[in-house]
């Protein structure tokens, strides 16, 4: 994969650092052991966070700032990591989708970064460009229908948008048939060390729960 960061993102977030994780995988419907880890993380949050204080987590606070700088209301279009943790703090379980989606969610809530998880074989081309959504740009969010991505950071392939920090696109989503994982960690707080730790956690989880092969990652700016 090649990742290009457009000038618009650099101008609103000059410290941005991302990580692109790739691996060959075998997905499954459910992992009891993985869900034990997710439930333990939820319990930790309920003992240490509130729905207000979670906004102060570095990765979440930085993503919210970028939304505002791009003209988007982060309380209406929440970063996915914030939405997931908020759901846990309300005493609700996360939606159980499949093992790949669930482990990406665990990595996201563990460190607070919004992470795009994709079936790499569904991309049009081998290059993704990170820019800002345009007014009227078509985008079908997973389980959300058509999403207004104007003012949202968005990754695009040759066909169009594939991922925002709020929701990934139906066209390139992961499923049980996914064999090529691409995960993008969005470090709007500029903390390369934590972005790397998040990428390494994804690889650890993929190797443990999805028979990961040839897993690797690289940093991009």
What are these regions (language model features)?
Residues 1-221:
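Charge-biased, low-complexity intrinsically disordered regions
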């Amino acid at each position: 994969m090649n990742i290009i960061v457009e000038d618009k993102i650099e101008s609103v977030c000059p410290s941005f650092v991302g990580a692109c994780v790739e691996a060959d995988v075998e997905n499954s419907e459910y992992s009891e052991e993985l869900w034990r880890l997710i439930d333990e993380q939820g319990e930790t949050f309920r003992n240490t966070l509130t729905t207000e204080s979670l906004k102060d987590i570095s990765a979440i606070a930085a993503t919210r700032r970028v939304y505002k700088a791009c003209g988007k209301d982060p309380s209406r279009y929440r970063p996915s990591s914030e939405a997931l943790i908020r759901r846990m703090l309300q005493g609700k379980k996360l939606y159980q989708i499949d093992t790949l989606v669930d482990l990406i969610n665990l990595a996201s809530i563990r460190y607070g970064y919004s992470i795009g998880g994709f079936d790499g074989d569904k991309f049009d081309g081998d290059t993704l460009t990170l820019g800002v959504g345009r007014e009227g740009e078509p985008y079908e969010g997973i389980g959300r229908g058509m999403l207004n991505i104007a003012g949202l950071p968005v990754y695009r392939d040759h066909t169009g948008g594939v991922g925002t920090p709020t929701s990934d696109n139906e066209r390139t989503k992961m499923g049980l048939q996914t064999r090529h994982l691409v995960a993008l960690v969005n470090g709007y707080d500029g903390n390369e060390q934590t972005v790397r730790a998040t990428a390494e956690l994804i690889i650890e989880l993929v190797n443990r729960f999805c028979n990961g092969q040839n897993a690797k990652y690289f940093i991009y700016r």
